[in-house]
Curated annotation (Swiss-Prot):
Gene Ontology molecular function terms on file: zinc ion binding
Polar residues compositional bias, start-end: 118-129
Record protein name field: Tudor domain-containing protein 1
Region Disordered: start-end pairs: 1-59, 72-136
UniProt keyword Cell membrane, yes or no: no
């Protein structure tokens, strides 16, 4: 981007007009269209640099600063044109006249083969001879007071139009004194404190003088500084209150046969696309306009009553980047208060609120639109409208591409539209001819009885015109050649970079001098290239990259964008990669791509990892032996684009083979039939994952024998009849961690490779829970195209998209699948399905514990086991616990258990994953004695039947809590690398507190896709955490009761259904985060039924009674009594019935005395009732 100081300077320099006769070899340097503020999102796209310069028919721009600087070339020159007084020449609406001959300034125009007479094509100076001569003559008569020509020829004296505040060029003038100039309203506000002391209203004579300006002079845009305004407050007025319409903008003066150049920034179809003009003047205009819009509308507020009209040019805030841009109103929806606008400097359009639209200030230069609407001339769509296939194909060829078009006709529509003749740079063919050849269009006037079909032979003839061919000009020409290797080739090389023995890069030593020359050329080229902040290469592009370790330039390929300002690049001549800032990249030229890519991707032949994966130690051994050393490289096979090679170090005697060294060190074992395997896979150079038929893959599960006893950890659980375990033998988990790391590295380096999912096929699958890749089996292909996969090392089933799958390499299948499906033997559900209570209890018994499993039976569906918890003082068999608590039934034999065990009943309890974590039924809070009254603070209100509070008095268990915190810290730190944990609402868990990063016991209040809201159960704090900061809590850490208490509002409450929201609102206002007095009335299942009282100005308020008085709840005591009365059989022999009647009478009397103590008629009625 243009630096701010250059941008400001550019407004003060005189831009020389283009020469229409002289052919330029290069266009002016490309600058972006925005100000240097960080605004990367434009209404459309950046203006791209052209391939060739402007050779003819470029356009000339008129600028205010040209006149001013031209007048400064000779201080003795006085302008004869009064239009220069305010630094601007132009025409008012509907009354534009050309300036006098000899004036070096013209309206904005696009040049053609015959330039206008008033414009000099080769100005030798900035002041014409005619003007100089006239000025000299005027000065000869300067002292002749009686000379009438003095007043007839001279305009107002030329004033300095530099900003009084900052000294930059400024065309805005104080409308009160009309003497002081400013560059912006911001500068005038800052200067008002000093200027207000000398600012006086302009004299009447000056007003008359300004009223007598020539008709072709555009009125200066002035800034009014009212005397009665406080310091720093100014108001901007326009020269007339009328709206700015499209016709008010300065004209481009396009003509037929004129050639224009620019970038296609918006493409709808061949009859409607926009080209953003390219020239240094347009860039300056856009930069100036961007700065002015930002300053003028920075703190603008919507105008009351302003309603844009169709055809009005206004300023609209673009939704994507929230920047202000000029736009033309195409439609207005008054009811919805929305406007449909088209951004005239870019070509795109959108529907935005009217509040985001403001009138265009007349204080801004009325530059012509930078984007012109175009249509392809000489062709019309075959079927009446352009097909989707046509739009897609042509858009791929033109969109964001620099092009040169010839204006064939100018159509007068709502906005200016040019019918253009466009030549495709990729093939040299005219676009209208290509559309006809491909069957998408016909010549005007041609009759076609049937719709033409796409001519496939034409597609072959214009092969360079297909979607893929758009890369010919800007991408294929910028991709270095690839060295080809054949089986049997042998050369002296250097191992440049090693990932693993199955992924490393070699260089041919014979090309070393060419590579050194290339590095010199790169350094020389990049040293002279001006850094471009608008260079945004696409993924796959080759460019020059400055390596971070030595600051030297190398050829690199863009692999991915790490952020908006950084990319991951791979150095194509060495094989290594790193993340670089965009500032360390620059475009590459074809000359630097003559040398083929020197990094050859290789695989070491004859070996495979002894542990199933290549360990860091194995990689180190190989690096010590061959990296950056001259070795003999022998190609024994091809694996797609990678070479299967043998590396031999002949500098020592005897010769050392890299494969044999790895085998001897114990990190690798010999792989048989390597050469046959490599030769059989030598096909076209396509990625291995999609070439030819899929390779037959083999995999195994963890193996067991009946009556074998092993240590296990439950990693996934659906029910006691289906859960998944990790068997802790032979360092299985350590090997799995290493495998997962290698798998993640492999998948991160490989782009999506078109993996075709097949049910039962192993693959690499992306788990969104933690953003890592894991081994999986395809379980189901859904109608939507998504795939359900079973993560074989953990047991969970997830739905993923096709781009979240990758082919898996055979070496990743050597380690047996670790997530073994299991079920508890000797038990069965009471009914057909496992109950939630049984599942929750089983969950509480196994969470986070290392258990002992005895294998009872083995079937194709998994392993039937007996689980025993040895962490307790005596062995605890899990199935016996469930039977003893009457949650499950004991079955007679393993076969019976198998028959009654539901298979894959995921829907029995939950369609989501059920993690092994204690639910709300398993954890306990401290219990208070009945009838005890305590002061407490209410922490969270779930409902009137459940809220959490913490006593105000300090707990006596502080020492135990400190010990528990230390144990939790040790436990949670040891759980790193475990699968992502998703708790449920009400579960107990371990949570990592933000302020100190320590782990504490917590209760889950709410959950979302990425966050969880927790209540710290021993301290009362509440915060929202990412899922990465919560872990399941083992049952052993729940033995100490939570220091908070679970409460429910005292029993006699019945909420009206329609008032539940009001009840919750009242409870939150009355109790939440406030000190209250709790009186324990009863305890049921660790929930305290309490009455809540709160101190107020009028004394203690009972919350429950307050709800009853507000009509949001009712007392159930009387209702229950009346209900129980109805249930008691009427018996004359029972005294309880009579006693109940007497009680009810006395209750009525007491209620009467309380409510109606002075009502005599009612008093007599109550006496009769008492006597009856």
């Amino acid at each position: 981007m243009m630096p701010r100081n250059n941008l400001e300077a550019s407004t003060c320099k005189m831009a020389e007009p283009f020469n229409f006769e002289k052919k330029e070899s290069k266009p002016p340097p490309q600058d972006p269209l925005r100000s240097p503020v960080a605004q990367h999102n434009h209404p459309t796209f950046r203006l791209k640099s052209p391939e060739n310069g402007n050779t003819k028919n470029n356009f000339l721009l008129c600028e205010q600063n040209k006149q001013y600087l031209a007048s400064q070339e000779d201080s003795s020159v006085v302008s004869s044109n009064p239009a220069v007084v305010n630094g601007e020449v132009g025409g008012s609406k509907g009354d534009r006249k050309p300036p006098p001959t000899g004036n070096p300034v013209s309206p904005l125009s696009l040049g053609n083969s015959s330039p206008p007479n008033q414009v000099k094509t080769k100005p030798s100076s900035n002041v014409t001879p005619e003007k100089s001569k006239k000025s000299h003559k005027l000065f000869e008569n300067a002292l002749s007071v009686n000379n009438p020509a003095l007043f007839n020829s001279l305009g107002p004296p030329l004033r300095s139009t530099t900003c009084h505040r900052c000294g930059l060029f400024g065309s805005l003038r104080c409308s009160q004194c009309k003497q002081t100039y400013y560059c912006s309203t911001a500068c005038q506000r800052r200067d008002w404190s000093s200027h207000s002391t000398i600012c006086r209203p302009v004299q009447q004579s000056l007003n008359k003088l300004e009223d007598n300006k020539s008709p072709f002079e555009t009125k200066a845009i002035e800034v009014k500084s009212e005397v009665d305004c406080p310091p720093g407050v100014t108001k901007e007025i326009t020269a007339g209150a009328e709206r700015v319409m499209f016709s008010d903008l300065r004209s481009l003066q396009l003509k037929k046969t004129m050639e224009i150049k620019g970038t296609v920034t918006e493409f709808k179809h061949p009859s409607n696309f926009y080209i953003q003009l390219y020239s240094s003047e347009v860039l300056e205009n856009m930069n100036q306009l961007s700065t002015s819009l930002k300053e003028t509308y920075a703190n603008v507020v919507p105008e009351d009553g302003y309603l844009p009209v169709k055809g009005e040019v206004c300023v609209a805030k673009y939704t994507v980047d929230q920047t202000w841009n000029r736009a033309i109103v195409q439609a207005v929806d008054v009811l919805q208060r929305k406007a449909h606008v088209l951004y005239i400097d870019y070509g795109n359009e959108e529907m935005i609120p009217i509040d985001s639209v403001h009138p265009l200030s007349r204080g801004l230069d009325l530059f012509p639109p930078s984007a012109i609407k175009c249509c392809v001339s000489g062709v019309i769509p075959t079927a009446g409208e352009w097909s989707e296939g046509c739009v897609a194909a042509v858009k791929a060829l033109l969109f964001e591409q620099f092009c040169s078009v010839k204006v064939m006709d100018i159509l007068e529509e709502e906005v200016l539209t040019c019918a253009v003749d466009l030549v495709l740079q990729s093939s040299g063919k005219q676009l209208d001819h290509v559309l006809v050849e491909m069957g998408y269009g016909v010549k005007p006037g041609e009759q076609s009885s049937t719709e033409q079909s796409v001519d496939h032979s034409a597609l072959e003839d214009v092969g360079r015109v297909t979607v893929e061919s758009k890369i010919v000009t800007d991408r294929n020409a910028l991709i270095p050649k690839v060295l080809t290797l054949n089986v049997g080739d042998e050369f002296c090389g250097v191992v440049a970079h090693i990932q693993t023995p199955e992924d490393f890069f070699c260089q041919q030593l014979q090309s070393g001098h060419k590579l050194a020359e290339l590095q010199e050329s790169l350094s020389e080229y990049c040293g002279h290239v001006i850094p471009r902040s608008d260079f945004y290469p696409t993924i796959g592009d080759v460019c020059c990259a400055q390596f971070s370790e030595d600051d030297q330039w190398y050829r690199a390929s863009v692999l991915a964008y790490a952020s908006e300002e950084s990319v991951l690049v791979g150095y194509v001549d060495y094989g290594n990669f790193e993340i670089l800032s965009l500032k360390r990249l620059c475009p590459i030229i074809p000359k630097l791509l003559d040398l083929p890519m020197q990094a050859l991707n290789c695989v070491l032949a004859g070996v495979k990892p002894s542990l199933g994966i290549w360990t860091p130690e194995a990689v180190c051994v190989m690096k010590e032996m061959v990296q950056n050393r001259m070795v003999t490289v022998r190609v024994v096979g091809m694996l797609g684009t990678r070479a299967l090679v043998e590396l031999i170090d002949k500098s020592v005697a005897p010769h050392v083979s890299a494969s044999k060294a790895l085998i001897d060190s114990g990190f690798a074992i010999k792989e048989k039939d390597v050469a046959d395997k490599g030769s059989s896979m030598h096909t076209a150079s396509v990625p291995l994952a999609i070439e030819g038929p899929a390779e037959a893959l083999e995999w195994t599960w963890v193996e067991f024998t009946v009556d074998e006893t092993v240590d296990v950890v439950v990693c996934m659980m659906y029910s006691p009849g289906e859960f998944y375990c990790h068997f802790l033998k032979d360092d299985a988990l350590e090997k799995l961690d290493d495998l997962n790391q290698s798998l993640a590295d492999y998948c991160a380096q490989k782009p999506p490779n078109g993996f075709k999912a097949e049910i039962g096929r192993p693959c690499c699958a992306f788990f969104s829970g933690d953003g890592n890749w894991y081994r999986a089996l395809v379980k189901e292909i859904l109608p939507s195209g998504n795939v359900k996969v079973h993560f074989v090392d953990y047991g969970n089933v997830e739905e993923v998209t096709t781009d979240q799958l990758q082919a898996i390499l055979p070496q990743f299948l050597l380690l047996p699948f670790q997530g073994m499906q299991c079920w508890l033997v000797d038990i069965q559900p009471p009914n057909k399905h496992w109950t939630k209570e049984a599942t929750a209890r089983f969950q509480a018994c196994v969470v986070g514990l290392k258990l002992q499993a005895r294998v009872v039976e083995i079937t194709a569906n998994g392993v039937g086991v007996e689980l025993t918890d040895l962490s307790t003082p005596y062995p605890k068999i899990i199935s016996d616990v469930l039977i003893r608590e009457q949650l499950v039934l004991r079955c007679g034999s393993p076969q019976d258990s198998l028959m009654s065990r539901p298979a894959n009943q995921h829907k029995q309890i939950d369609s989501h994953r059920v993690q092994a974590s204690p639910s709300a039924e398993q954890w306990k809070t401290m219990e208070l004695p009945v009838n005890k009254t305590i002061a407490a603070n209410v922490l969270e209100i779930i409902s009137p039947a459940l809220f959490y509070a913490i006593p105000s008095e300090m707990s006596e268990n502080q020492e135990k809590l400190c010990v528990l915190a230390a144990e939790l810290l040790e436990h949670c730190n040891a759980q790193k690398g475990q699968p992502a944990y998703r708790p449920r609402t009400g579960d107990a868990c371990c949570a990592k507190y933000t302020n100190d990063d320590f782990w504490y016991r917590a209760i889950v209040l709410e959950t979302s896709e990425s966050d969880v809201k927790v209540l710290y159960a021993d301290y009362g704090n509440i915060e929202t955490l990412p899922l990465s900061r919560v872990q399941p809590i083992p049952a052993s850490h729940l033995e100490l009761p939570f220091q908070i208490i679970r409460c429910s509002l005292e029993g006699p409450m019945e909420l009206n259904g329609s008032c539940s929201q009001l009840v919750m609102e009242l409870l939150r206002n009355a109790m939440l985060n406030q000190s209250v007095v709790l009186s324990v009335k009863a305890i049921s299942k660790n929930v305290h039924a309490v009455s809540v009282e709160k101190c107020s100005e009028n004394g203690m308020i009972n919350i429950a009674e307050n709800l009853v008085m507000c009509g949001l709840a009712e007392n159930l005591t009387s209702k229950r009594k009346s209900a129980s009365t109805k249930e008691i059989p009427h018996s004359r022999d029972c005294c309880c019935t009579e006693l109940q009647k007497q009680i009810e009478k006395h209750e009525q009397i007491l209620l009467f005395l309380l409510n109606n103590p002075t009502n005599q008629s009612k008093f007599t009625e109550m006496k009769k009732l008492l006597r009856s």
